[in-house]
Amino acid sequence: MEALLQLKGIDKAFPGVKALSGAALNVYPGRVMALVGENGAGKSTMMKVLTGIYTRDAGTLLWLGKETTFTGPKSSQEAGIGIIHQELNLIPQLTIAENIFLGREFVNRFGKIDWKTMYAEADKLLAKLNLRFKSDKLVGDLSIGDQQMVEIAKVLSFESKVIIMDEPTDALTDTETESLFRVIRELKSQGRGIVYISHRMKEIFESCDDVTVFRDGQFIAEREVASLTEDSLIEMMVGRKLEDQYPHLDKAPGDIRLKVDNLCGPGVNDVSFTLRKGEILGVSGLMGAGRTELMKVLYGALPRTSGYVTLDGHEVVTRSPQDGLANGIVYISEDRKRDGLVLGMSVKENMSLTALRYFSRAGGSLKHADEQQAVSDFIRLFNVKTPSMEQAIGLLSGGNQQKVAIARGLMTRPKVLILDEPTRGVDVGAKKEIYQLINQFKADGLSIILVSSEMPEVLGMSDRIIVMHEGHLSGEFTREQATQEVLMAAAVGKLNRVNQE
């Protein structure tokens, strides 16, 4: 089968790092090509070379059989290559039609916008995707899943023959994910080629035909998905066998450190639980169950309306995140780009941001040597891959950004570490490193709350698990009691079993 798109022998270097070396990618009509690799493997760089954001240093790009060079996103888009980014590029205050045709509106012979034609054409695009809503609806009124469908419709408006989807299900519910897969099947039947970038093995084996593996900027293999197992694919990605995906540390927790009684706040209703020294407490539940809200109320990022919290026997009142930090409670957000990191600042500045008091003299000036030493120690301990501590953190891979976010929390010397979706958007190799770090914190006596939507992660890493349902605690289970079935029953409200200490 002749490829719609071929990239061969692609090289791309930046100061101090070779991002791509001999990388290759083929996209075939009517097939979905998964592009996988650890964070930092070169997937994003390859997409930027393909769409003309970066100029390649070497290699060839064949588009519909002809050697081509795209001068920028506009030229690749007009040629028929569409990309749907992880962060959606839509304007909430405009309608669907206005978003789809932004900058290329239909005009009548008087030079005015032809709204009737524009909405009719947008409705046709939505109908192609079997969507039930009309294009006069505001994008801000749509769910994230439906907004993603608008992005696909926008790509189709350019008559795109190849569509690139970057982590498309990251913020979707299970129902929205199934809708996306239905649309992908529809696009395949129209002969379009799809590049599907994802860390989620289940999705790759469900919806992709072929897979291309990158490792350290190099092309490793192209295979039919049907010829692989999850283990063999992971082995190609990381270059080694992952013997134990969730390396649980069997060490008995100590005395009760944190006690939460009848906590209430926005989205949180009468929640009570305990957390021991050197314990990993898993928090499970469906999207919207109130897990993140509970953590934010506990930390001080959301207001507490009632309830009582003690830490090491002393009452803790957190009216702001500063109160949480001052009391030894650290929260690492699920949305590191919005709440966790300052992307324009360096690795060093991000890591030491909340711990500057430890590096300050009485007059307020910084002890730069102490700060640099501490940051250097954490970079080494956490195996953060960065050319230097002065590198802008926005240029690091997702896994390395997450390590910096966790390191920043630990710099404040906390007693309780709350990790909200710590491995979201992180590849399998970096996940394993984060799990090993969590075990190290546990061994050092740190109390850890692990909030995760990945049930195997919660089951694999936790000593004890609590489950949230509609703002309430619907279950509490020991490691031995917990199974996927039991946790899911509690998550949907079919089971209510809470054993308070």
From Swiss-Prot:
**MF terms (GO), sorted A to Z:** ABC-type D-ribose transporter activity; ATP binding; ATP hydrolysis activity
According to the UniProt entry, what is the EC number of this protein? 7.5.2.7
**Which Gene3D superfamilies does the entry link to?**
P-loop containing nucleotide triphosphate hydrolases
Q: Which PROSITE patterns match?
A: ABC_TRANSPORTER_1, ABC_TRANSPORTER_2, RBSA
At the top of the EC hierarchy, this enzyme's class is: translocase
The answer to whether keyword DNA-binding applies is no
Per the record, its GO cellular-component terms are: plasma membrane
Catalysed reaction equations from the record: D-ribose(out) + ATP + H2O = D-ribose(in) + ADP + phosphate + H(+)
Q: Which ranges does the record mark as transmembrane?
A: none
Q: Which residues form the ABC transporter domain?
A: 5-241, 252-495
Q: Which domain of life is it from?
A: Bacteria
Where in the cell does this protein reside?
A: Cell inner membrane
The UniProt record gives the binding positions of ATP as G37, E38, N39, G40, A41, G42, K43, S44
Principal place where this protein is found?
Answer: membrane
> What kind of membrane protein is this, topologically?
Peripheral membrane protein
The UniProt entry, under SUPFAM superfamilies, shows: P-loop containing nucleoside triphosphate hydrolases
Which UniProt key words apply to this protein?
ATP-binding, Cell inner membrane, Cell membrane, Membrane, Nucleotide-binding, Repeat, Sugar transport, Translocase, Transport
Q: Key word Zinc-finger present in the record?
A: no
Give the similarity note: Belongs to the ABC transporter superfamily. Ribose importer (TC 3.A.1.2.1) family.
Q: What does this protein do?
A: Part of the ABC transporter complex RbsABC involved in ribose import. Responsible for energy coupling to the transport system.
Q: Could you give the subunit structure recorded for this chain?
A: The complex is composed of an ATP-binding protein (RbsA), two transmembrane proteins (RbsC) and a solute-binding protein (RbsB).
| Protein name as it appears in the record | Ribose import ATP-binding protein RbsA 1
Q: Which gene encodes it?
A: rbsA1
